[in-house]
């Protein structure tokens, strides 16, 4: 996949969306890990441009997608697993809203994050995304649902 770059300093609004239930509790300190990412991004872009919200259930994604559309969020950081990412992409695509999306892996398998070479280590992750490296992802669709890596029967 071709790599390009974007200047994250030009983003007006960044939203971190994290799923507190992803990862089957593999990361007992998940909120602490995600909060550290939030603090680091906030220190780069400033408090007024950076916000964080948690997903209690996938149904919350409808309201989050609406918020992203209304507030014209430039960059969404998804802290979750493959299921969270897929569900989020499905909702945001329906809004015809396409912010830059980064993945901070906190799921069980994290296949999407692995394919994008995203580290689970906070400092390495922030260093990479702060460089503004963009990797296009091509969505697939089967039985009316979006998929990013694999689909099955």
For every predicted segment, state its role.
Residues 15, 44, 55, 94-153:
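Catalytic core of DAGKc-family lipid kinases
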Residues 20, 79-81, 104-106:
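Glycine-rich beta-strand-to-loop/alpha-helix junction loops that act as flexible
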Residues 57-58, 81-82, 118:
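Short beta->alpha junction loops/turns
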Residues 75-78, 100-102:
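Short, conserved beta-strand segments within well-ordered enzyme catalytic domains
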């Amino acid at each position: 996949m071709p790599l390009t770059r974007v200047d994250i300093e030009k983003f007006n609004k960044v939203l971190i969306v994290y799923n507190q239930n992803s990862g089957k509790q593999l990361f007992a300190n998940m909120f602490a890990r995600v909060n550290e990412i939030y603090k680091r991004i906030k220190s780069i872009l400033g408090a007024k441009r950076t916000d964080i919200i948690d997903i209690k259930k996938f149904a919350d994604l409808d309201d989050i997608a609406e918020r992203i559309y209304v507030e014209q969020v430039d960059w969404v950081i998804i802290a979750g697993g493959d299921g969270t990412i897929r569900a989020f992409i499905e909702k945001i695509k329906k809004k015809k809203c396409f912010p830059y999306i980064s993945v901070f892996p906190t799921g069980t398998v994290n296949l999407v994050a692995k394919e994008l070479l995203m580290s689970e280590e906070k400092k390495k992750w922030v260093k990479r995304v702060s460089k503004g490296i963009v990797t296009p992802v091509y969505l697939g669709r089967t039985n009316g649902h979006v998929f990013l890596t694999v689909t099955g029967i």
